[in-house]
Curated annotation (Swiss-Prot):
Coiled coil: none annotated. Residues 625-703 form the PDZ domain. It is found in: Cytoplasm, Cytosol; Cell membrane. Residues 805-819 have a biased composition (Acidic residues). It comes from Homo sapiens (Human). This is Phosphatidylinositol 3,4,5-trisphosphate-dependent Rac exchanger 1 protein. Residues 421-496, 523-597 form the DEP domain.
Length: 1659
């Protein structure tokens, strides 16, 4: 074992590290004096290294000659063999000369050169062999490179152009494939670059050889001459000069890193992308490390200050041996994952340290994690962007090549298949094997022989390569899937012949392309599709073929007319359109073509009768969704078949089924999204059995009525239900297992009548008067039950009051009740039942809540499978309670603000001048106004909590005084579409079913009873609502909201009437919003930074106590570790509270010996997984010899080599930890100083200069000097008086705390000054509406994904289970994209312009909201598995989703562990009429507003897409599946291609070319929907009322989803939209808003008019 030393004899240390020593990389020989023994050892070592270099020169030369031979045989020979074919494809002789230049001359030179090398080094290289003269002999011949290098750029440009021609691209790929190279390893560009890379590599190799060749070696002078000669050769060629400079820069950098391990930089990287200093947390240590990001590699090092051991030197200088850094670790970026860390996080990987500006790096090869922290948010962003760019560059290139290669192989496979099926060839036939017949197969050796015969290949190796490529890409397979492709008598079969082929050609995406084109063509204001006359006949809704080609070229969809014609043929072949007289295939001519979908809508179809595959309505349903958890033995109910319907036969008393509200005789429509009412009864029983065996909760859709009559026994002694509220009174809670529950009474039902008399406008007491128990016993009448409540809030409130009464010693009865409540089943049901037989009945007429209106449709898909669609609208549950909680959070936030401001006012009572008086007066008025707002919010919250009916907010008809409902979303409904169909066995894909004329079979059910065929279930969810708006009357005099709001000093407010006309984006100046946000952010940052700083102090004190108390050895550490693991990492209470409790945050620093390096990446066994050599260096020795150094501590008093005084006896690892902690503390102090010195603080002082504070800005800034003095005191303490270190630290922290408090006070005043109280009220109302709708939409999509029903990737045949898991992982990693689509008309409707200006501001504020998840311990509410809690302030609101244990366990581990999700909100808006020619003066401004909104949103969506793309390109994040390349192409490349295409279209809509604005129409609406749907967004569609426009848009989007993902025939798209629009559940929304006027704009494009009722007979 060789220990590292600081320097090398002869000054060659740097060089040592630059090239790996095969025995001990980076290790230097211990210099034990200048004796002869040491010199001999050194000489032996140099010769050993020389042998390594000789081997490398010979090995790489052989590889290089192999590459040149491959280029010659695979490309040049092949092109010459097929001259005519090549020329036809575009590879003329001239093009070939440009591409390959004189590469054959280079090959001839290198054949001779290799022979000369092998002759010199025969038989095997030895260290005494001489090589220099070989290079000198060939130096003139290397001039052959001049021609090649000067031509290289031209060759690359030509190759880019040729690659645009599909036939050339396919031909070049096939050359590579037949040559035996895996097409995706290196592109042709890479091979063409290899001669330049090789000639540049020679000087580097010779330099290394010269370094290892001792002066006495006979080869020494020749090697030196050869090095100079090769440098001269390279410097004479410009291209190689540039390449050399790059390589030398990498080599130079590597030479500065001591102890380098693994392959050299110049071997695997081409450029340095980013470098910088970061804090790294791993294995309990915080260290400062220098990081270098290259393409393919991340390296991190420790910075060297100076030679270890020298006490006097204090300046940071280079080490004697020239190195600046000490190697610490490397990770190949192929195996590296990066995860963002929210500021303020403290978890296992950060070892309890609070992370700011940080991210995690995961080495998946070794499953090792560490955390990196940058000094600023900007620097962090720079690093994350660079890492994403590096990954994109690497993966995108590979994916593109894989796609091209796949397409080429698929086409070749199809061509060969048709040739082999020819009767003359007769290769594919039934063959005998032993006693059986193997149908439709061919033999490997016959196949290769035939390929040779027809000239497809020139040698047998090429045939084997082609066969293997066909096999790997899923075109052929061995008949029993046992063998790879062999040139032997082995049987293979084309997958076309046994139905296992999955088509993945570009045309496979024709369905989504066709739907997209149809929507875009029909969204134009100037239609291309219209009625046209020809020969005295009018053809309806047609377009000439040539016009379509022109349009496709103008829009950029196709590059050439040929490509456009191919797309047109694809559309005709796949059932989108046809020639009007069925006479011609699609051509670039003036013949008319029509979309089938238009025929179906306009009745021009020759076949008007309904066909079997048309979209048909099956049944209308009104139902309620029940959630039933499994019990010990069953679900608590039985079913039976009655009149071909599945009905409930019996329900157990007190069971969870009864609690959910299940009643005997009710029809069941669906169980866990399976439409059981369409199945045979035996299969329904099987479904229930399967669900129970896997202990899954049941989601039942059960028939119900809007109003029901319930008969309840009137018992004289107890009440088994509770009633609250008035007008109408409602059921607050029902006792579990009681008669009322058995009769069907459920919490939340509104009571309309009692015994026939109307009680709708009465209160709860009037209803209860009808019951004996209440009349006789009043409040004591409640029985001892486990109560099931209406909402979680009710359950919590009841529990709290119960606990309060239990604590009261006089409440004996309450205690008994509590005990009974915890027991179960709580009630002896026997005697009660006999009682109630004779007892009189009370009849209640109740209004049911949470009803779901649904419609079931069916159609036969393109694959011939019968599909069912259940479409429902649902009112979002709990939206009133959620609004109330948001208002309570706002009120609490305001209360703290008012309290702080009043405290501050009280501090400074002296009023000196008039400006002081005015400022004070303004502040008092504002505080009073905020106080009134708090009271209002509290009152509204109480109103909303008790509100039950109606369970949603209707569109208001006219303005009204402000009330609680103004904070709830209007007409908010969640539109669910559940699609189910049998999973088909893999069959020939769409494009091939047409080519081969095979009919896919209808998949029937398994004849065996109890065995179910697998089904596919998918749920799609879109919310419709009225755009959030402010429709309140101006505040009247004396009204609480009206006071103090009209003073001119309040900024933008200019009287209420003026404000009513405009929205927030106009009223709130961007600058005002930004400065207010900046004040609030700074205030919060200071708070957080101060808490964190105190945590570091606690950690340092803890560390010092372990150092200075040697008596408490291992046991102390062990208890510490235990305590640390049991405490939460970040306490919820403030630092002051924590110190009051006498507790401190403990962080365990106990680290196993072998982990004391940088997180194990750096120790011998964890080096880069692709290292070419093993490290034997003693990791602990090397670590303790050169200790951690910090730029913060690298001052005169404290260098990295300084040690604490000996009498403290601190072990070196503890010193390292102390350095790390102090480093972190000083980092925090620096960041606090930076915040307090920043421009925001200066602005706050400027704004509040009229308020008499104790100090001016100058005095305030001088306080920083105290902190600087405090720091130098700490450094002196470390050096001279370590016992006093805790006191020095305490002094520093006290100074900082005072400094921060002064800053926060100033910010409070500035905030008060710039707050506009009236606008804040409006902002709150609109924000609340948007947030509540967003939360309800996300929660519906989340539950679908947790139940494995979410799937936005159905068109790629991905299962809902995989897609759901992927989406959950995606949102955990990248956040939630919220897509809001607005169909408002700002140019023509003044109110809608105001709405648009309001929501633009508000939706951007949603980006500050975070979602997190907790587990629900116990649930006393039926049929809900999620409820919400709100924390935080307006600027950082946190929504906590409480999920039941079943769903919580399915969350990604990151979310289970408490990580939060961020919202990314995008608003796309488009008016549904052409405003270009409108005379209205505001139309241009409205158009500009839409343009700005869309541009900003597109940028956000593209940013999200970049993050998502990076996430999916991480191989390890994809579902682990050992399938072939083909599946990966399907589920990764095709979706990415589609997203790229959609982004391109969106850019053309948002930034149209000059003069092309009219040609894009309203296409932005369907395209933005598809883009966001594919990105996994939660979707919300809004218009003025949430009725006409938004509901039609949803119907269109749902029909498009069915066509893209679920095989709806293209001709049925508009038919489906029309039926869903006019007969679907959304007609209920119109029924609920009868007097509200809303209609489609007059000039709406054709797509939105086709489904409207005809006006005057015109469609």
């Amino acid at each position: 074992m060789e220990a590292p030393s600081g320097s090398e004899p002869g000054g060659d240390g740097a060089g040592d590290c630059a090239h790996p020593d095969p025995r001990a990389p980076g290790a230097a020989a211990p210099s034990s004096g200048p004796g002869p023994c040491a010199a001999a050892r050194e000489s032996e070592r140099q010769l050993r290294l020389r042998l390594c270099v000789l081997n490398e020169i010979l090995g790489t030369e052989r590889d290089y000659v192999g590459t040149l031979r491959f280029l010659q045989s695979a490309f040049l020979h092949r092109i010459r063999q097929n001259v005519a074919d090549s020329v036809e494809k575009g590879l003329t002789e001239e093009n070939v000369k440009v591409l390959f230049s004189n590469i054959e001359d280079i090959l001839e030179v290198h054949k001779d050169f290799l022979a000369a090398l092998e002759y010199c080094l025969h038989p095997e290289p030895q260290s005494q062999h001489e090589l220099g003269n070989v290079f000198l002999k060939f130096k003139d011949k290397f001039c052959v490179y001049e021609e090649y290098c000067s031509n290289h750029e031209k060759a690359l440009r030509l190759l880019v152009e040729l690659n645009k021609i599909p036939t050339v691209r396919a031909f070049l790929l096939s050359c590579m494939l037949l040559g035996g190279r895996k097409t995706t390893d290196i592109p042709l560009e890479g091979y063409l670059l290899s001669p330049i890379q090789r000639i540049c590599k020679y000087p580097l190799l010779l330099k290394e050889l010269a370094k290892r060749t001792p002066g006495k070696h006979p080869d020494h002078p020749a090697v030196q001459s050869a090095l100079q000669a090769m440098k001269t050769v390279c410097s004479n060629i410009n291209e190689t000069k540039r390449q050399m400079e790059k390589l030398e820069a990498l080599e130079q950098l590597q030479s500065h890193i001591e102890g380098w391990e693994g392959s050299n930089l110049t071997d695997i990287c081409t450029q340095l992308l980013l470098q910088g200093t970061l804090l790294k947390i791993s294995a309990g240590n915080i260290q400062e490390r220098a990081f270098f990001l290259f393409d393919n590699l991340l390296v991190y090092c420790k910075r060297k200050s100076r030679v270890t051991g020298s006490k006097k030197s204090t300046k940071r200088t280079k080490s004697i041996n020239g190195s600046l850094y000490i190697f610490r670790g490397r990770i190949n970026t192929e195996v590296m994952e990066v995860e963002n860390v929210e500021d303020g996080t403290a978890d296992y990987h950060s070892n309890g340290y609070t992370v700011t500006n940080g991210w995690k790096i995961h080495n998946t090869a070794k499953n090792k994690w560490f955390v990196c922290m940058a000094k600023t948010a900007e620097e962090k962003q720079k690093w994350l962007d660079a890492i994403i760019r590096e990954r994109e560059q690497r993966e995108s290139l590979k994916l593109g090549m894989e796609r091209d290669a796949y397409v080429m192989i698929a086409e070749k496979g199809e061509k060969l298949y048709h040739m082999m099926m020819n009767k003359k060839v007769n290769l594919i036939k039934d063959r005998r094997r032993k006693l059986s017949t193997v149908p439709k197969c061919f033999l490997g050796n016959e196949f290769v022989a035939w390929l040779l015969e027809i000239g497809e290949i020139s040698k047998t190796e090429e045939g084997v390569n082609l066969g293997q490529a066909l096999l790997e890409n899923g075109i052929i397979h061995h008949v029993s899937d046992k063998h790879q492709f062999k040139n032997e008598q082995v049987m293979y079969r084309f997958r076309y012949d046994d139905g296992t082929y999955k088509a993945r050609s570009e045309l496979e995406d024709i369905m989504s392309k066709g739907v997209r084109l149809y929507c875009r063509l029909h969204s134009l204001y100037t239609p291309v599709i219209k009625d046209r006359d020809y020969h005295l006949k009018t053809y309806k809704s047609v377009l000439p073929g040539s016009k379509l080609v022109d349009w496709l070229l103008a829009q950029g969809d196709c590059q050439t007319r040929e490509e456009a014609v191919a797309l047109g043929v694809g559309l005709c072949n796949n059932g989108f359109m046809h020639h009007v007289l069925e006479k011609s295939e699609f051509r670039d001519e003036s013949q008319y073509f029509r979309f089938h979908a238009d025929e179906e809508m306009e009745g021009t179809s020759s076949k008007n009768k309904q066909l079997r595959n048309d979209f048909k309505l099956v049944e209308n349903i009104l139902a309620k969704r029940l959630l039933i958890l499994p019990q010990e033995e069953d679900y608590g109910f039985d079913i039976e078949e009655k009149n071909k319907a599945v009905v409930v036969k019996s329900v157990q008393r007190g069971s969870l089924a009864e609690v959910a509200g299940l009643q005997v005789g009710r029809k069941i429509y669906s169980i866990n999204e399976d439409l059981v009412f369409l199945r045979p009864f035996s299969e329904v029983e099987s479904i229930l059995n399967q669900s129970f065996c896997s202990r899954r909760p049941l989601r039942l859709l059960v028939a119900t009525k809007a109003k029901e009559i319930i008969k309840i026994p009137d018992q004289p002694d107890t009440l088994c239900f509770q009633i609250r509220g008035a007008a109408p009174p409602y059921v607050y809670a029902v006792g579990r297992g009681s008669e009322a529950m058995a009769a069907g009474l459920c919490a939340g039902q509104c009571i309309l009548k009692v015994n026939g008399s109307n009680v709708m406008n009465d209160g709860a007491p009037e209803v209860l008067e009808h019951f004996q128990a209440f009349r006789s016993r009043r409040e004591e009448a409640l029985g001892l039950y486990q109560w099931i409540y209406h909402t979680h809030e009710d359950a919590q409130e009841a529990r709290a009051s119960q606990e309060a009464s239990t604590e009261d010693p006089s409440g004996e009865q309450a205690q008994e009740e509590d005990q009974a409540d915890s027991a179960f089943p709580l009630l002896s049901l026997g005697p009660r039942l006999s009682l109630c037989e004779d007892s009189p009945m009370v009849t209640l007429t109740v209004d049911n809540v949470h009803l779901e209106h649904g419609v079931v449709y069916e159609y036969v898909s393109t694959a011939g499978v019968r599909c069912h669609v259940l479409e429902k609208i649902v009112e979002p549950r709990g939206c009133f309670g959620l609004t109330a909680k948001i208002l309570e959070a706002f009120a609490a936030n305001d209360s703290v603000f008012v309290e702080n401001c009043r405290r501050l006012m009280a501090l400074s009572s002296a009023i000196v001048t008039m400006p002081h008086f005015e400022f004070r007066n303004i502040c008092d008025t504002k505080l009073e106004s905020i106080g009134q707002r708090i009271a209002c919010y509290q009152e509204f919250a109480a109103q909303l909590k008790s509100r039950v009916s109606p369970p949603f907010k209707q569109a208001p008809l006219e303005p009204h005084p402000l009330c609680g409902l103004d904070f709830c979303p209007t007409n908010c409904h969640i539109n669910l579409m559940e699609v189910s169909y049998p999973k088909t066995t893999p069959s020939v894909g769409r494009s091939f079913s047409i080519r081969f004329g095979r009919k896919p079979s209808l998949i029937g059910l398994d004849p065996e009873q109890g065995h179910l065929n697998p089904m596919s279930y998918t749920q799609h969810c879109i919310t419709t609502m009225a755009a959030p708006s402010w429709k309140c009357l101006p505040a009247a005099e004396g009204d609480p909201q009206g006071q103090g709001l009209h003073d001119g000093s309040f900024g933008p407010a200019s009287g209420t009437l003026g404000q009513e006309d405009r929205g927030l984006s106009f009223l709130l100046k961007q600058e005002d919003r930004e400065i207010q946000d900046a004040y609030l952010q700074l205030f919060t940052k200071l708070d957080v930074a101060l808490k964190e700083m105190k945590q570091y102090v606690t950690q340092i004190n803890r560390l010092l106590s372990t150092i200075t108390e040697p008596t408490s050895g291992g046991s102390c550490d062990a208890s510490l570790a235990e305590e640390a693991s049991s405490l939460p990492l970040v306490s919820e209470e403030s630092e002051m509270d924590r110190s009051d409790h006498g507790g401190i945050k403990k962080v365990c620093f106990k680290v196993a010996e072998e982990d004391q390096e940088d997180s194990g990446h750096d120790t011998m066994s964890y080096r880069d997984s692709y290292s070419e050599c093993n490290s034997n260096r003693d990791s602990v020795l090397s670590y303790t010899s050169v200790r951690s150094n910090s730029s913060y501590l690298g001052s005169d008093e404290m260098g990295s080599g300084d040690e604490l005084p000996c009498d403290m006896r601190i072990p070196s690892d503890k010193q390292d930890k102390l350095h790390g902690c102090l480093e972190h503390l000083f980092n925090q102090v620096d960041s606090i100083n930076a915040l307090l010195k920043g421009p925001v603080m200066s602005r706050a002082f400027e704004e509040t200069k009229h308020f008499p504070m104790n100090h001016s800005l100058q005095e305030f800034k001088q306080k920083e000097e105290c902190t600087i003095r405090g720091r130098s005191l700490i450094q002196i303490s470390i050096q001279e008086d370590p016992w006093n270190l805790p006191n020095s630290i305490k002094t520093l922290v006290d100074n900082i705390q005072r400094y921060v408090e002064d800053g926060k006070n100033q910010l409070l005043l500035a905030l008060l000054k710039c707050t506009d109280t009236e606008l804040q009220l409006r902002r709150d109302a609109i924000f609340c509406q948007a947030l509540v709708a967003a939360v309800c939409t996300f929660s519906k999509q989340l539950l679908a994904a947790l139940g494995y029903r979410y799937n936005n990737n159905g068109e790629y045949e991905e299962s809902s289970r995989d897609a759901s898991r992927k989406w959950l992982e995606q949102v955990a990693a990248t956040g939630v994209l919220l897509h809001c689509q607005s169909l408002l008309s700002p140019a023509t409707v003044k109110e809608e312009r105001t709405m648009l200006e309001d929501i633009w501001v508000t939706l951007s504020e949603l980006d500050n909201v975070t979602f997190s998840f907790k587990q629900l311990d116990e649930n006393y509410v039926a049929n809900t598995n999620v409820f919400y809690h709100i924390e935080g302030s307006r600027q950082a609101l946190k929504v906590i989703f409480y999920l039941d244990s079943y769903h919580f366990s399915k969350l990604p581990s990151r979310l289970e562990g408490g990580a939060s999700l961020r919202l990314h909100t995008a608003l796309f808006t488009k008016v549904l009429e052409n405003v270009e020619g409108l005379p209205s003066p505001g139309s241009q401004a409205a158009e500009d507003l839409q343009q700005d909104i869309n541009a900003q949103s597109l940028e956000k969506v593209q940013q999200y897409y970049r993050k998502l793309r990076a996430f999916y390109l991480e191989r390890s994040n994809l579902p682990t599946d050992a399938s072939t390349t083909a599946v990966k192409i399907d589920q990764l490349i095709r979706p990415i291609n589609a997203l790229d295409e959609l982004c391109r279209l969106m850019k053309s809509f948002v930034h149209p070319k000059p003069g092309a604005a009219g040609s894009v129409g309203a296409g932005l609406i369907p395209i933005s929907s598809e883009l966001c749907y594919r990105l996994g967004a939660c979707q919300m569609v809004m218009c003025g009322t949430g009725m006409q426009r938004s509901t039609l848009s949803v119907s269109l989007e749902q029909a498009a989803i069915l066509a893209r993902s679920h095989g709806l025939l293209p001709k049925c798209i508009m038919q489906a939209t029309d039926i869903m629009r006019k007969q679907g559940p959304r007609v209920e929304i119109l029924a609920k808003n009868l007097r509200v006027k809303d209609q489609m704009p007059q000039g709406a494009p054709r797509l939105y008019r086709l489904c409207q009722p005809p006006v005057d007979g015109d469609l």
